[in-house]
Amino acid sequence: MFLKDFSFELPEDLIAVKPVFPRDSSKLLILKSLNSYQNCLFSDICDYLLPGDLLVVNNTRVNASKIIGLKKTTKSKIEFTFISNEKNGIWLCFALPGKKVSIGNLFVFKDVEGKVINKDKEKIYIDFGTKNNEFTSILKSFGEITLPPYISKLRKFEDQDNEDYQTIYAQKRG
């Protein structure tokens, strides 16, 4: 199997850039066998579940972890996606454009400053030190959900995306 096996043309007008409402009116593809499938709605799912079947649901909340940082020396805007608070205020993140980020750079996120202490290929580590709690609050208040590239090229982030990109079972931060 090759990556090119998954490449195909998908017209933009077939890409859903917003979820359907109500949510259970979304499409559901039922695969009956290798050569037999049926299109239906998610609200019909109970018609296809049998006793003993296992239905797995995702109860993880999508983190709003994308935020713009200003490079302290040049004031250039860099888009950061924060993945995890590794330890003692040191965060693992990715940046676009990553090539403009170097070890030792200082970035300001709203009014909290962080220093790049390590960079390994795409991974970047920023130390917020004693300002970690303040940064965490800023990320919760101003962070955005990262939209998939096929959507972000068609439209900008909207506040409603913070709810629309959560499953109805979302409880735990993930």
Enumerate the language-model features and the residues they cover.
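A cross-family signal for N-terminal binding/gating loops and helix N-caps
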Residues: 1-174
